[in-house]
Amino acid sequence: MNIPPLNDAPSLQVAAGVATITLQRPALRNSLNNQDLSTLLDQFEAINANPDIRVVVLRAHTQDMPHPVFSAGYHVAGLDGDTSAPNFFQTVPDALTRLRPITICALNGSVYGGATDVVLACDLVLAQQGMAWRMPACAIGLHYYASGLQRYVQKMGLSLSQRAFLTGLSMPFEQLQAGGLFHALVSESQFEDHLHQLVQQVLGLAPGAVQATKQSLLDVAEGMPDIAAIQAREASSQSSADFAEGRLAMQERRKPVFQGR
């Protein structure tokens, strides 16, 4: 399943259980307009409807950019005359957070504004050294939306979130990695190899167990977990064919072959 992009809107390509979404507007620092947001929501819906997709990689076209930018966030022209635009923007990271497959952000450039929340909405983030992170909401007079603030505090902690929002200053990725934000922080030359290894690592896990565990972790992080639902997921995994295969593979000292059952 490939969904062709409209002009320079985000593209979606699917191969071997991996869906790759690419932001591809480098001339405007991969900023996102309303059409892009609608495209992303449609792509998320298509991904959730395809049970063969087990990993989603979100990346950006940064080649030939003198200073690589993953995304500059919401295209500010879209705010003119539409004060509700941030409410529409938040639907993208909110939906991304709850995607069924495991999501990996291939953060191969600096990131700004609302795009930082898109990054935080991913389950795992592989980042490139030498880049920067900036949240200028208060610098343009905007109070950020609640779910975005929640993701910031959950993923970055209160102290770094305060530094990001209450100063509006740029923070180097190296500073954020000191707090454990990224799965790994690697050089440009190593980036693609590390990304491939991470994707393969996730693909090697039992799909039912890892997707159910993702949902349970999110439920717990939001502070009001449905214990009965989590226990039901646990019980389902214990009776699954994949759990039986995992135990057998461990006994036979081989890699398991999971079927998602």
Map each language-model feature to its residues:
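Charged catalytic carboxylate motif
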Residues: Q35, T39, F88, A95, ...
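Acidic-histidine catalytic/liganding microenvironments
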Residues: N50, L99-R100, S240, R253-K255
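A generic structural signal for short coil/turn motifs at secondary-structure boundaries
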Residues: R29-L32, L79-D82, A221-E222, Q259-G260
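Helix-loop "lid/cap" segments that line or gate small-molecule binding pockets
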Residues: A164, S216-V220, R233-Q238
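A structural preference for short, pocket-lining loop segments at secondary-structure junctions
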Residues: A16, I21-Q24, S38-D80, L96-C105, ...
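Amphipathic alpha-helical segments at domain termini/boundaries
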Residues: M1-T20, Q24, L169-L203, Q211-E222, ...
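A short acidic, glycine-rich active-site loop
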Residues: A77-Q90
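Crotonase-fold acyl-CoA enzyme core
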Residues: D94-P207, E245-L248
